Amino acid sequence: MSKKLIALCACPMGLAHTFMAAQVLEEAAVEAGYEVKIETQGADGIQNRLTAQDIAEATIIIHSVAVTPEDNERFESRDVYEITLQDAIKNAAGIIKEIEEMIASEQQ
């Protein structure tokens, strides 16, 4: 089974931080061996929308947001790791590692 990380990034203005966080998360996830899909919710609306299949197949789901995302109910049946946009931008690789460690300890 392949590892899949999905994320949703959103901020009030949806201009810079949303896309900076998305880019850094994508780079860190690929480096960690994940298939990646990231939805952004910004000034230009929802881009790269996460589907029900994406959500069902995800190993890790991250919300890096500064606002409540649109269509947030899609994630109600899954564990979602919520982080700030600043944390994603500054330490995406470290956050992914922390989440992996939490998941591993829960499975023991």
UniProtKB/Swiss-Prot annotation:
The modification Phosphocysteine is found at residue 11. It is found in: Cytoplasm. The active site is at residue 11. Residues 1-101 form the PTS EIIB type-2 domain. Keywords: Cytoplasm, Kinase, Phosphoprotein, Phosphotransferase system, Sugar transport, Transferase, Transport. The phosphoenolpyruvate-dependent sugar phosphotransferase system (sugar PTS), a major carbohydrate active transport system, catalyzes the phosphorylation of incoming sugar substrates concomitantly with their translocation across the cell membrane. The enzyme II FryABC PTS system is involved in fructose transport. This is PTS system fructose-like EIIB component 1. The gene is fryB.
